[in-house]
A protein has these predicted regions:
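Metal-dependent catalytic core segments for phosphate chemistry
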Residues: 17-20, 396-429
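Conserved "right-hand" nucleotidyltransferase catalytic core of DNA-directed polymerases
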Residues: 1-7, 15, 29, 104-112, ...
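Hydrophobic "anchor" residues on beta-strands that sit immediately upstream
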Residues: 1-3, 52-53, 78, 387
Length: 496
């Protein structure tokens, strides 16, 4: 196997040269070092027929970088091992590992949870070096850069060996690599974005928010600030020495503290609905809470109107945040090619699901929500192309049924694929509505406590405990799976 790493003068979209390259042939334990004068020799070495090549983040960076500057370069994807992909697969619980490592000083806190090569260097005790921290480190080639490059290969090989000791399957590793290749291709292709229509939507949302804020400004009471006691008279300001003056805060519609004071302290709204609270009992001010207040027939008309305006302002703020105001606003991320090149990590969550950033395309509002259709239609295709949408069905429950198979001979799996699993869960939990069953099962699977589960039926933590007990009684395979996992984990220490 050939373990390699390159150093360039910039990121993928900007780089103009590869300064150096190091390749470790693990079969002979030989390190090859390539400088600007013989870089092509190193690139040709990677193309040796039948040789497996290995590197960290090479699918997303190193290999595309080489291809960009040397178009004749080609590699067999099935012969590529990316230790970033490998590590994400076998060390998905890296945050739990890092709790201890940061506490004892092995890993710097800034690298907590990171899958970077630098972070793994600390975890494995094979440090990368600090050359990259020097000023203009990548402007020109230096011997120190080559040494740093070689150390990256050393860390990569150590990480590969560590990953190889973890239990996984060739099928899983192959699947994750295929997903990474596909996501990189998708990111490079980008999503065609209708910028003109986005600007129109921005204007519509901003004008609507101005209208909402004007209504709020005329309705909200003045919010008390600190009491000011002047030490001397001030005729122009009307101050009298020693006479207290009540000052007031400027109204900030996005301040949850101010909104809570208006609703709870000034209007005495009780927030008695359990769905208005977090699991630890705190009032949560969000769109859902305000929608519940609007529907509360016992609330005064003025309170319901305020709740409606607050809810709409929160919604508009959220939509404008996604569109333009936020750090990753869509309009800020449109490239010169008219596309948004969002990043997808196909194994970013501890559950094995994908994560998205710059921007989070998965959070584009769906058509059933306010302004959802207008947001969705911004993401389009080049002229002459057709856009097709697909969705996966019941992923979590299908995965769950796989692990339940030894305990129920595939009964749950059969219901997932051929029946209506949410209706089955509804009956098992004794819930009146199918949608309640969907909310319940996902909350249950992701660790919701009794209080949270109780909220599903508008009850207490005691109701939640009873609901959980009934569901486990009617679905014994899940209870057996829980016991199996607990017993299995008790035999191991979590860590690298």
């Amino acid at each position: 196997m050939l373990v390699f790493d390159i150093e360039t003068d910039g990121l993928l979209e900007d780089l103009t040269k590869i300064h150096c390259m190091c390749i470790k042939d693990t079969s002979t334990d030989t390190m090859y070092r390539y400088t600007p004068e013989n870089i092509e020799d190193g690139i040709k070495k990677l193309m040796v027929a039948g040789e497996t090549i290995c590197g960290h983040n090479v699918i997303a960076f190193d290999l595309p970088a080489i291809k960009k500057l040397y178009p004749w370069f080609t590699v067999c994807k099935d012969k590529v091992i990316d230790t970033l992909v490998y590590a994400r697969l076998v060390f998905s619980e890296v945050n739990y590992i890092d709790n201890k490592l940061t506490r004892i000083g092995v890993l710097p806190k800034r690298l907590y949870g990171s899958h970077s090569l630098k972070a793994y260097g600390y975890r494995l005790g094979v440090l990368k070096g600090t050359y990259c921290e020097t000023e203009d480190a990548w402007a020109i080639f230096t011997p120190e850069m080559l040494d740093y490059n070689e150390q990256d290969v050393v860390v990569t090989e150590a990480l590969y060996k560590k990953c190889s000791k973890k239990t996984t399957t060739e099928q899983a590793l192959s699947l994750e690599h295929k997903a990474q290749w596909l996501m990189v291709r998708m990111e490079n292709n980008g999503f065609t974005f209708d910028k003109e229509k986005a600007i129109e939507l921005m204007s519509t949302l901003q004008n609507k928010q101005i209208e909402v804020l004007n209504q709020l400004a005329h309705m909200v009471p003045r919010i008390p600030d600190k009491v000011f006691i002047p030490k001397r008279d001030n005729k122009s300001k009307g101050y009298k020495a020693g006479i207290p003056i009540q000052r007031y805060k400027e109204f900030n519609p996005n301040s949850r503290q101010q909104v809570l004071w208006i609703m709870k302290d000034y209007y005495k709204y009780p927030f008695s609905n359990p769905d208005m609270h977090t699991e630890d009992g705190k009032i949560q001010l969000n769109e859902e809470t305000f929608k519940l207040i609007v529907k509360d027939t016992e609330a005064p008309e003025e309170v319901r109107k305020l709740a409606e305006l607050f809810q709409e302002n929160f919604l508009l703020t959220k939509r404008l945040g996604q569109l333009i105001d936020g750090k990753n606003g869509w309009l800020k991320l449109v490239s010169e090619d008219g596309k948004i090149h969002g990043h997808v990590n196909p194994n970013g969550a501890i559950t094995g699901r994908a994560t998205h950033r710059k921007p989070n395309i998965a959070q584009v509002p769906h058509v059933g929500t306010e302004y959802g259709k207008e947001c969705r239609e911004l993401f389009t295709v080049p002229e002459g192309w057709y856009q097709v949408g697909i969705d996966a069905c019941g992923l979590e429950l299908r995965c769950l049924s796989h692990y339940m198979y030894p305990f129920d001979n595939g009964e749950y799996a059969n219901e997932c694929v051929n029946g209506d699993i949410h209706t089955k869960n509804q009956i098992a939990a004794g819930l009146p509505e199918r949608n309640m069953a969907k909310t319940f099962i996902y909350g249950f699977l992701y660790g919701a406590g009794d209080a949270k589960i109780g909220q599903i039926v508008g009850g207490t933590a005691e109701h939640g405990a009873e609901l959980r007990k009934k569901f486990l009684k009617e679905t014994p395979a899940i209870k057996k799976l829980q016991s199996y996992v607990k017993n299995l984990l008790s035999e191991y220490d979590v860590g690298l």
